[in-house]
From Swiss-Prot:
Keyword list, A-Z: Hydrolase, Pyridoxal phosphate
Catalytic activity: 1-aminocyclopropane-1-carboxylate + H2O = 2-oxobutanoate + NH4(+)
Its biological purpose: Catalyzes a cyclopropane ring-opening reaction, the irreversible conversion of 1-aminocyclopropane-1-carboxylate (ACC) to ammonia and alpha-ketobutyrate.
Active site location: S85
GO MF annotation, one: 1-aminocyclopropane-1-carboxylate deaminase activity
N6-(pyridoxal phosphate)lysine: residues carrying this PTM: K58
Record protein name field: Probable 1-aminocyclopropane-1-carboxylate deaminase
Gene Ontology biological process terms, A to Z: amine catabolic process
Pfam families named among the record's database cross-references: PALP
Amino acid sequence: MSTPAYLTKLESIPKEKFLFGPSPISYLPNLTAVLGGKVKLYAKREDCNSGLAYGGNKVRKLEYLVADAKAKGCNTLVSVGGVQSNHTRAVTAVAVASGLKAVTVQEKWVPIDPPLYSETGNILLSRLMGGDVRLNQETFDIRHKKATEDAFKDVEAKGGKPYYIPAGASDHPLGGLGFTNWVVELAKQEKELGVFFDVVIVCSVTGSSHAGTVVGAVAEGRKRKIIGIDASGKPEATRNQVLKIARNTAALLDERLEIKEEDVILDDRFHAGIYGIPDDETIAAMKLAAQTDAFITDPVYEGKSMAGMIRLVKEGAIKEGSNVLYIHLGGQPALNAYSSYFPHA
């Protein structure tokens, strides 16, 4: 059997090697039992995918972007995120590992200021790695930002050659490739495990993890359902961005690959109304996962997608007998900045 065109193209695109290998898949037996046992719950652990500063989904995506940056002779990665951004921590990590510099604009995406919020967690790790961290008062938005443009020009003015990486490594020509390849990786693991995951749950904000997974699922043609859980609080913008990235990624890999609007499923019931702030359902979901399978999530992303998965199972929205795969995108370092939400947890 010949290799599909999209796979041939995907394998031809240069990338760095920042991951240990395939991210592990673990069964969640206790959470499965607590939720009734009618569907089996598993997790694919992007939080365990790399040795670079706690890894995470962004490291997988950045394998392609850093290869592109190096091919273009760039010496400084310039990007943006919130104060507790997993992405900017990952950008700094891959820069250090690649002998590059990193300039990260850390905006006030979350309208709270708990004690030490801008001193602990992800931003502490970025500073520890020697990143050029620049605090900024701009609020949350997944669009391209002027502050990042200013940082880019500043690097140029000082004689550097910057490479721009948008928030989440998402709205970039190569942003969806990491998670398209994730589906290819998953299919190989399924063959080894003797299981097929009917439903995949993924958190969605800047959109490329969700979009890449959709492209991979459509391309393989195995009727796998990808459910995005919005954590942006701006679901219309997120849905549009996921569809845009998915279509651009598909076009890059195979012009015959069609992504339809209905391929992008985004459940908008669990974002708590705003990016970066957990509600009672988020916190309850985090505690349940932690107290059943010692499965640690964060209050910004994974806590909200965990809340989504738990409610979908409880509602019976997932067909009995299904194997559900939750993508753990990482992000636990941010938990250190949210201790005020967990008094004597």
